[in-house]
Regions:
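Gly/Ser-enriched beta-turn/beta-hairpin loop segments
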Residues: 114-118, 156-162, 171-180
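Sec-dependent N-terminal signal peptides
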Residues: 4-13
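Catalytic histidine site
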Residues: 19-83, 112-114, 134-136, 167-176, ...
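Positively charged n-region of N-terminal signal peptides that target proteins for export
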Residues: 1-4, 162
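Catalytic nucleophile loop of clan PA
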Residues: 185-212
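Short glycine/Trp-rich loop-beta-loop segment that forms part of the substrate-binding cleft
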Residues: 126-157
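Hydrophobic alpha-helical segments and helix pairs
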Residues: 81-125
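C-terminal cap/linker of serine protease catalytic domains
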Residues: 207-256
Length: 256
C-alpha cells in the first residue's frame, strides 16, 4: 500500500524518524554563478576537527572562480531559521582545493577551519561500508530517501533540501567492488547530484548507502535522410556511488 512521504518521515518509531532527520540536517546547498548542487557534511573521529564536504566532481569542476557558497541554516530563538551563506574556497590560484576520487565522479573538500555558526554533520561511521550495508539488509525494491535541491529548489527558502522517495532498482547487496554503482527508481533531475541516499541501520540511525551522481537516460540515435541526432529518453532513475567510495574519498582528503 502506498503511503505519503510525510508518513514515512514520521514513521511509527522515534528511531525511524531520527534517521531521516539526522541525514536531512547534514545535507546542504552548494552554489555559485555556475553551480547549483547538493552536498553533505561529515566528521572523522577525534582528534580530527575538520569538516568534510562531499559532493560530485562534475559540480565542483564546473563551478567558476575560487569560491562557492555553502548555505547553512541558523536556528533562531523563535523556532525559525536564518540563512547563512558561508564562503568556501574551492580554488587557490586556479588549483582545486578539493580531492577527487581516482575512479568516480566524487569529490571531497576538507574544511580545516569549520564554518562559523550552528550546523549539523554526520559521523563517517554513518556511511555504509560493505559490512554496515549487509547488516541493514536492504533489498531490491526496498525504499531509500534522497535529500537534494532539484533544479536548485529549496523546500523552505532558508536553504532546506527536498526529501525524495526512491526504491532500489537493482540488488543493493551485490559486491560493491564489482558493482561500484547502483540505480534507484525516482524522477531524477538536475540538482540531485551530490545528494545522499539514506536508509535506517539496524539501530534506527542514518546509514548513507551512497551519493547520487547522475540521472539515467536511454540514448536513441535517430537517422533521417539529412541528419543523425541522439534523442535522450529519461528513465526516471538515478545512479549512486556506493558508500564505501565516499569513505575512501574522505580518507584521501584527510591526508592532504
Amino acid at each position: 500500500m502506498f503511503r505519503p512521504l510525510l508518513a514515512l518521515l514520521l514513521a511509527a518509531t522515534v528511531g525511524h524518524a531520527n534517521y531521516a532527520d539526522d541525514a536531512y540536517a547534514a545535507t546542504f546547498k552548494l552554489y555559485n554563478s555556475a553551480l547549483s548542487g547538493t552536498c553533505s557534511l561529515y566528521r572523522r573521529p577525534a582528534p580530527d576537527t575538520a569538516v568534510y564536504l562531499v559532493t560530485t566532481q562534475h559540480q565542483l569542476e564546473g563551478s567558476k572562480g575560487d569560491y562557492s557558497q555553502l548555505v547553512l541554516r541558523e536556528p533562531q530563538p523563535d523556532g525559525s531559521y536564518k540563512r547563512n551563506d558561508f564562503k568556501v574556497v574551492t580554488r587557490i590560484n586556479g588549483k582545486p582545493t578539493w580531492v577527487k576520487h581516482p575512479k568516480f565522479d566524487l569529490a571531497v573538500l576538507r574544511l580545516a577551519t569549520p564554518p562559523t555558526g550552528t550546523f549539523a554533520t554526520l559521523p563517517t561511521s554513518a556511511i555504509a561500508n560493505d559490512e554496515r550495508l549487509k547488516a541493514a539488509q536492504p533489498s531490491v525494491g526496498s525504499s531509500l530517501l534522497l535529500f537534494t535541491f532539484p533544479h536548485g529548489v529549496e523546500s523552505i527558502r532558508q536553504g532546506f533540501p527536498v526529501a525524495r522517495q526512491a526504491v532500489f532498482a537493482q540488488p543493493p547487496l551485490l559486491s560493491s567492488e564489482t558493482y561500484p554503482t547502483f540505480q534507484a527508481d525516482f524522477p531524477a533531475t538536475a540538482g540531485d547530484s551530490g545528494g545522499p541516499g539514506v536508509i535506517a541501520d539496524p539501530n534506527g540511525k542514518p546509514l548513507i548507502v551512497g551519493m547520487c551522481f547522475q540521472r539515467l537516460n536511454h540514448d536513441e540515435k535517430v537517422t533521417t535522410e539529412m541528419t543523425t541526432t541522439t534523442v535522450k529518453h529519461p528513465l526516471n532513475m538515478g545512479t549512486f556511488i556506493h558508500g564505501r567510495y565516499l569513505l575512501e574519498a574522505i580518507e584521501l582528503a584527510a591526508k592532504q
